Structure formats: structure tokens, C-alpha cells
């Protein structure tokens, strides 16, 4: 299996972490590390990670660098064949990652893969990019 790391950018998302991170941790295959890059949170995000999710790696950024800036700084500190970037308000089911890694391994010309995002409030509907709260199908 290739080295893959799930990196979740967080800013003041303690409640999102409590609600959604358990599914990400539970669905991560053996050998895939889950990491949270904290974008200078001022809430209890770091405390929640330390006490409730001790197996999750934490990258502490000293300020809120925004979405792109936060991920750019975080990914400079992570080594992997594949980086799986998730928002902090995403729930993942068992088996969501295998098809993604399979495509990346089989198709060397593919650089980016995204699963379908299903609405958190109505799982019969597709969620658009940029919306908040989802479920990976």
C-alpha cells in the first residue's frame, strides 16, 4: 500500500472535530495516518485533540493562514506518496479510501481524485463544492 496521510485543516473547530473526526479515524485503513493541521485555533481544538484523539497527529500552525496558506504550510511538514485533504466537517464511511488510492496507483497521469460528497442533511442528494457538512459516499 502506498504511503498516504489524511490531513484535516482545522480552525476553531473543536465541535466539528468531536462530531466528525471519529468516522475518519475509524475508516482510516491500517498504515494511513490521520493528522490535523491546526490553523492557530483559539478555542479548545488542541485540547480536544490531545484528550479525545491521542492517535491523531497534530501539526500546530502559529496563526490562521487561511485555507490555502494553512494547507501549504502543513503539507511542507508531511511526507507521503498521497495527501488526502479533508475538511473538518466531513464524515467518512468504511472503505472510502481504497478506490481513491486504487485510481491513483493504476493511473499515473491522474493527479487529483475526489469522491462524491453527499449532503449531511439529506443523504439522497449530492452536495456542491464549497458547501458545509457532508458525507463521503
Protein language model regions, located:
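Cell-envelope/extracellular polymer assembly enzymes that use nucleotide-activated donors
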Residues: 3-5, 33
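Short, acidic, metal-binding catalytic loop of nucleotide-sugar glycosyltransferases
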Residues: 23-31
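Short beta-strand/loop segment that forms part of the nucleotide-sugar
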Residues: 31-40, 59-61
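Glycine-rich, basic loop-to-helix element that forms the pyrophosphate-binding segment
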Residues: 60-78, 88
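Acidic/His-rich active-site region of diverse nucleotide-sugar glycosyltransferases
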Residues: 69, 76, 91, 98-137
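Short aromatic/hydrophobic "clamp" motif used to bind/position activated sugar donors
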Residues: 83
Amino acid at each position: 500500500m502506498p504511503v498516504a496521510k489524511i490531513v484535516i485543516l482545522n480552525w476553531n473547530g473543536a465541535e466539528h472535530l468531536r462530531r466528525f473526526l471519529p468516522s475518519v479515524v475509524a475508516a482510516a485503513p491500517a498504515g494511513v495516518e490521520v493528522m490535523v493541521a491546526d490553523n492557530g485555533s483559539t478555542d479548545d481544538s488542541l485540547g480536544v485533540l490531545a484528550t479525545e484523539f491521542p492517535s491523531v497527529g497534530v501539526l500546530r500552525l502559529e496563526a490562521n493562514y487561511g485555507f490555502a496558506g494553512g494547507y501549504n504550510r502543513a503539507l511542507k511538514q508531511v511526507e507521503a506518496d498521497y495527501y488526502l485533504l479533508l475538511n473538518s466537517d466531513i464524515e467518512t464511511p468504511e472503505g472510502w479510501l481504497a478506490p481513491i488510492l486504487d485510481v491513483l496507483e493504476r493511473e499515473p497521469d491522474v493527479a487529483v481524485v475526489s469522491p462524491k460528497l453527499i449532503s449531511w442533511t439529506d443523504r439522497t442528494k449530492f452536495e456542491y463544492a464549497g458547501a458545509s457538512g457532508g458525507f463521503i459516499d
